[in-house]
């Protein structure tokens, strides 16, 4: 959920702008056709109880990878000794945020692709180009239209030096509308490992199709899943 700086909801949401606020639900719909990483568990639903003469309610059972749809990766996802998602401090997942567009930038989003929305070196704390100092959360939009019917094997990813720069600038959380911050066929996962080294948090599979560049309030709280490697947000 995104809000234009000034409010507070729940689900991935962004809010931005002057009153009345614009509110963006940045979670894609989740259903049996939702794209999943090749080999991962897709969404499925079974009814285990149905309203009838002897049952007053409908109850379903869900099966899915926690990486289906908009989600937060836990350190456990890329570090065998890392924290599970239910153990994480929620602070990075709520608060001031900047959305930066890096559309059509190729397979890797590099620092120069974000430079137009970052404070200039050497003093990156000053206002510049109409931007305020960088908030501690950054969402990078890489798609004009996020794929919602098939997995993108050529997904745009973040170069590790881009994550490194954002960490140096004090960012606590990095998010994207791509399915991963690393290329789909990456084995060493250099950007995830940069996230790990700096203790950052990461959001993936966000729906940013209609979200403009600018500063917002982010609300993307993971579930308290005490042994999981990720959580829907």
What spans do the regions from the language model cover?
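Active-/binding-site microenvironments in catalytic and ligand-binding cores
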Residues: 2-233
């Amino acid at each position: 959920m995104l809000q234009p700086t000034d409010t507070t909801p729940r689900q991935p949401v962004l809010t931005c702008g002057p009153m009345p606020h614009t509110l963006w639900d940045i979670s894609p719909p989740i259903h049996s056709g939702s794209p999943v990483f090749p080999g991962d568990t897709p969404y499925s639903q079974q009814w285990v109880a149905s309203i009838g003469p002897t049952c007053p309610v409908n109850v379903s059972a869900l099966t899915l990878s926690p990486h289906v749809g908009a989600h937060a990766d836990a350190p456990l996802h890329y570090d065998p000794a890392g924290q599970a998602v239910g153990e994480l401090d929620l602070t990075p997942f709520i608060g001031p945020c900047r959305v930066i567009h890096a559309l059509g930038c190729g397979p890797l989003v590099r620092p120069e692709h974000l430079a137009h929305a970052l404070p200039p070196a050497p003093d990156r704390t000053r206002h510049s180009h109409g931007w305020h100092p960088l908030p501690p959360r950054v969402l990078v939009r890489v798609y004009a239209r996020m794929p919602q019917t098939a997995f993108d094997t050529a997904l745009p990813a973040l170069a590790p030096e881009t994550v490194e720069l954002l960490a140096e600038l004090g960012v606590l959380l990095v998010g994207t509308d791509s399915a991963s911050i690393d290329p789909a066929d990456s084995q060493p996962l250099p950007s995830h490992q940069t996230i790990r080294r700096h203790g950052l948090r990461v959001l993936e599979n966000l729906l940013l199709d209609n979200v403009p560049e600018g500063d917002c309030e982010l609300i993307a709280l993971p579930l308290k899943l005490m042994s999981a490697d990720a959580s829907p947000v």
